């Protein structure tokens, strides 16, 4: 209502103000008659300075001229301010004369002129002394005059021209306005001294102003700067710490259209004029004016076809002086008139007159532009057209009159014209654009997603677009040269783009785009803002243990825009509780080890709400309407932001209070895995080699698969002549004689010689072949047994491997079920968010939930009324979401407190509370990460059987020579029990009777319990049965009333419980199954046999060694290095040379070398 009042009110009698803000960088005009209430208000009236310059003087030496406009500067601006120095300028020809504003059609000026001489005041005439004149002039005529005493304006300080209602301000007060809004085309100040005059040229922008008692105290320009975007979108300049999503709607947008078809053919209408022969036409009676016209047809504009088919029975008569046709202005015949000729006007008529001169004279008489004559061998009944022939008779013919002018309004054609419009889909990518896609309009950021969508057959059945829940286009497809191209429409600005407010200051932008100058922050990118402008990237500086400002994950964003990493303070000590006992009459004497699991949610999923985008989507009309709702979005965001901030701080405190110092240090020693064999994963211990390094170097080793008996064979054949004992060292395996299959060269020589010798004398020496045959059979046995064992082991390996795979699959399946149960519990959080998104499809009583459809079907007022319902409904959904997140935060906060207690009491120590850490007496708890929480696996022992004992509270002792006293069990020692007439003490949680010692008791001074005896007057609530009747008293209050308890059997409720106990048992079974799958293979050994090199190899090595020594000695001798030889090797023939250098190179001090 405020803005509407500003536009409609008459402002001539209202004083207005124009205040300067921001180092004189902009001006804010507001009308004093319509001052808004205290607070922030968004409307027009702000003008940002875009150009500043000064002027010292322009009047010359004689002084300036008053009562006239002599100096002007040309502009094209929304506002121009001309200001004098702070002290102002006097109203005199020695300083100030005239200032004016030119609004193209009229000029507003202020001047003074107390002169009565002729021509002294050409515009205003004489102005009274000590008065000034404010006038408006149009076409050299004054239509507004206002004379003001100088007591109101003692000196000239400023004149400001504003396009809004052509307002003019003198010294900050409104002195002129009109109903027109026009830019300032020129302005100027005519003065001699007192300057300089400062000119400020401004452009108009919206502003958010803060008013106190009707006066603007602060102004924020809606100019696209970060501060302007934030303040003007949320209608406030005061922000609490947090993150504020924003949409930059001030970006310059391009436009493009996506057409359904690549080309459109449009067939234009073709008008037919059909002419025919006129029967019973009367001949003329003399002259062309008596020729009667028939079938006159006049074309208007468009395409025409003139049908003269009846002329086929007529004979065309060409022009022959005065005879026949006459059409020099028409270069066509009637038979070709439809060949695409262009006319500005066209009219055709038929007439019957003399062929002799009828056409030519008709053209001369301006009856037609062209005339075509046709003969049909008619009678000679037509009269002449010339003065001397008016009574003569001539042959009658058909005359076709054509009246035309050249142009482009009319075209003749033989067939309808088809206009082909080629549609080119020039899609603008990767920038904010306004689009018209298949008839749906909007704005968005278009990206090509063909590479991602081409394999999923989207829109494969001829569809053109996929719409989102608001009815706007989400994905559309365009037929390209090489196939279908898919495009995604995103909001012009990323929904996740948020302003960061810390310490009440706008310090940065958090966005999902990796822009220049940004730095990564968790899964977002942070851009620092200094003094309202972006700053280049800075690294994260320093660590803090806590953050009183805004936090994002583990990062603290400070009021100066810097970022620090939050490193929670670690715990330095562990605290273990003392043992305690519970009160039971039955004392357990046997126990079972029990494993129980417990899931506790410690964090919640935070949401980021772009309120404006959720409510209005891309609808510009809805966004304009939404401005009337004020700070409702700010209120919702403040709730969500505060929840997120508290969540981060409590989560950091949770980890800082539970994370022990050095918890990441692994302990790898003294690790016992019990029956679970993981030896295959450990490094085997080193063992001594069977041969030395020299043996491995000087002998060739051959490895083969051996049997367990091969180790004994190797020991038996050890030594230099061990090969002679080969057959003697044979061993038996399962009753079979076996020898290793490897035969050395010595063995081969030995057995070959034995075989050859056995064949030398036939049967006499044949017994010599027995060793050869025996060793051969033993080695064949060795190979056969080895192959059999390999096959058996292979079968065992396959069976065991299959069994292990089965158990692993079962383990994975069991783990998957446990995780699924965790997921089911955690996913309960998203139900309210799902409901919120589903609200986008609800119409809330409107005709549709699609905003664009509403504005297309209804007029503006009706559409706003319908959209108002949707806005109210969606805001309600957001409010429900904010309330749900707030309630969820309180619930999760309590869960975190419980988790802290569990970690401190169950994980870091043994709990003394029964069934607090699992079910039963606590032994050990192992925590595991889970989605949004922690899973505790509690190991406890629970009673299996109990012993029923007689418990004694204490003993009363009556000594012979002293007063009586009592003894009771000391705290934590257990209880006194009686067993078979004897007294013992045992623990409360485990039956372990033992003798009572002095350390187990506490001595009391008396055996009696102390009570305090009081009478009835002390405690007035005590009553006797004889003076209080309950039935009588209750009848006063509960008479004639009926009370029914609810049927709790019908009370159904569902609580999500995480139960992975059975899955843990199945995993334990899988572990046992994996242990069972260990393979007990038949023992095989590796037999390593060393083969000595032949004699010629050793001979070659000896020759090579001798040659190497000779060459080395010769090198030492020739290079004068024999000292080394003498000292190291003691070569006697060289001793005489050892005291000096070689004689070949001996020189003395007095030698001259040339």
Swiss-Prot record:
The signal peptide here is: 1-18
For this protein, the record's CDD domains field holds: gammaCoV_Spike_SD1-2_S1-S2_S2
Chain ranges sitting on the Extracellular side read: 19-1096
Q: Which Gene3D superfamilies match?
A: 1.20.5.300
List the residue ranges of the region (Heptad repeat 2 (HR2)).
1025-1106
Judging by the UniProt lineage, the source's domain of life is Viruses
Keyword Coiled coil annotated: yes
Question: How is the protein modified post-translationally, according to the record?
Answer: Specific enzymatic cleavages in vivo yield mature proteins. The precursor is processed into S1 and S2 by host cell furin or furin-like protease to yield the mature S1 and S2 proteins. The cleavage site between S1 and S2 requires the optimal sequence [KR]-X-[KR]-R. Additionally, a second cleavage leads to the release of a fusion peptide after viral attachment to host cell receptor.
Where is the region Heptad repeat 1 (HR1)?
A: 770-875
Return the PROSITE patterns for the record.
COV_S2_HR1 (PS51923), COV_S2_HR2 (PS51924)
| Record topological domains on the Cytoplasmic side | 1118-1154
Could you list the residue ranges that cross the membrane? Answer: 1097-1117
Q: Residue numbers for the site described as Cleavage?
A: 538-539, 691-692
One Pfam family of this protein, by short name?
CoV_S2
One of its GO biological process terms is: fusion of virus membrane with host plasma membrane
Residues in coiled coil = 823-867, 1056-1084
Entry keyword Coiled coil:
yes
Tell me which HAMAP family the record gives.
GAMMA_CORONA_SPIKE
Subunit relationships: Homotrimer; each monomer consists of a S1 and a S2 subunit. The resulting peplomers protrude from the virus surface as spikes.
Which family is annotated?
Belongs to the gammacoronaviruses spike protein family.
Recorded protein name is Spike glycoprotein
* Source organism (scientific name): Avian infectious bronchitis virus (strain D274)
Name of the gene = S
